């Protein structure tokens, strides 16, 4: 962990611009913006910033509190490692097909919410896609190590894995705080939801503590708590998928969340074709409707889930779902066309 004083977010998919983050002024005096970065959560860099003129002691306490929450959920959501005295998603996956396992109430609440989102998104946000996602993940990793041997999954591999993605295999006993995966070949993967959910929990803790004028950036998931002292927001850039050194659109945001999913970040190439990491549950292949999709809504967990679910939906279906949930969305199509909801248009910065 290190203390930082300016925004250095050059690898994020959604990036607060330096021009939008100059030190605000309070009626009394100029205040120093404060920030800390953390490198241990969700395999990415996380940032906590304050523009509220907090004392150093108050900022240290609040940033430590937010960091602690991110760390707690990082451990709960980890599908690769178990931790002493704690049953997490890795524990559940390794015991698939076995007996029910007692878990922390926080993990119960999360999994219940995940199942609700499955219904809300008509199955496009499915945390039981682990059997399929792991195949693509392993092949993408192998291609990075040896590009000459890169391949895509066979139809047989995907069809077999696709038989083990039934959300009903995730059995939750809320009263007794236990979870069971009934299918021994099924597994949980919360890559489309976990980071946003953890970010939202950290933001709610900050809000309950009276924080205002804070910004969380957890690997590109932006959650803003309040506004700058003068009541203004932050200018946030959405990368141009065709040239990621530039911005396709700039947004002015305050007291909300912003999450982008894109086909240009995690991918590998086979025979000149790019295969990215956002897998459509209907085809078991990377979704090809859009190059980039940005969601703005206050709840970071919902923003995270929708950025994946809508990426896997035709435009008309996605627009209808976004409207029903009060989410603002910006779609960038493979040919460069940009569409957005009426509310998103109001957020576009001049």
How would you label these PLM feature ranges?
Residues 2-10, 14-350:
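Mature catalytic core of soluble alpha/beta enzymes
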């Amino acid at each position: 962990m290190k203390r930082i004083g300016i925004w250095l977010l050059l690898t994020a998919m959604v990036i607060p611009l330096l021009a939008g983050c100059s030190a605000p002024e309070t009626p009394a005096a100029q205040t120093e913006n404060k920030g800390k970065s953390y490198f241990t959560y969700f395999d990415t860099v996380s940032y906590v910033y304050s523009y509220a003129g907090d004392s150093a002691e108050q900022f240290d306490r609040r940033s430590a509190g937010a960091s602690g929450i991110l760390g707690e959920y990082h451990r709960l959501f980890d599908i690769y490692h178990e931790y002493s005295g704690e049953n997490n998603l890795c524990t559940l996956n390794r015991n698939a097909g076995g007996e029910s396992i007692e878990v922390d109430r926080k993990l119960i609440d999360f999994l219940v919410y995940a199942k609700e989102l499955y219904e809300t998104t008509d199955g496009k946000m499915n945390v039981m896609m682990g059997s399929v996602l792991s195949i693509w993940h392993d092949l993408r990793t192998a291609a990075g190590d040896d590009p000459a041997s890169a391949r895509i999954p066979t139809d047989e591999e995907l069809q077999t894995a696709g038989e083990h993605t039934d959300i009903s295999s995730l059995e939750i006993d809320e009263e007794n705080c236990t979870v069971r995966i009934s299918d021994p070949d099924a597994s949980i993967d919360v890559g489309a939801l976990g980071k946003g959910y953890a970010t939202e929990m950290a933001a709610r803790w900050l809000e309950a503590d009276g924080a205002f004028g804070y910004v969380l950036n957890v690997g590109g998931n932006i959650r803003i708590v309040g506004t700058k002292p003068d009541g203004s927001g932050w200018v946030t850039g959405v990368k141009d998928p065709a040239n990621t050194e530039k911005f396709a659109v700039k947004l002015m945001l305050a007291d909300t969340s912003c999450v982008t999913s894109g086909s240009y970040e995690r991918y590998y190439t086979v025979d000149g074709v790019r295969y990215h990491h956002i897998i459509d549950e209907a085809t078991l292949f990377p979704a090809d409707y859009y190059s980039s999709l940005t969601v703005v809504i206050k709840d970071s967990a919902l923003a995270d889930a929708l950025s994946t679910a809508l990426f896997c939906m035709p435009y008309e279906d996605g627009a209808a779902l976004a409207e029903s949930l009060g989410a603002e969305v910006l779609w960038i199509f493979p040919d460069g066309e940009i569409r957005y909801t009426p509310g998103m248009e109001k957020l576009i910065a001049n």
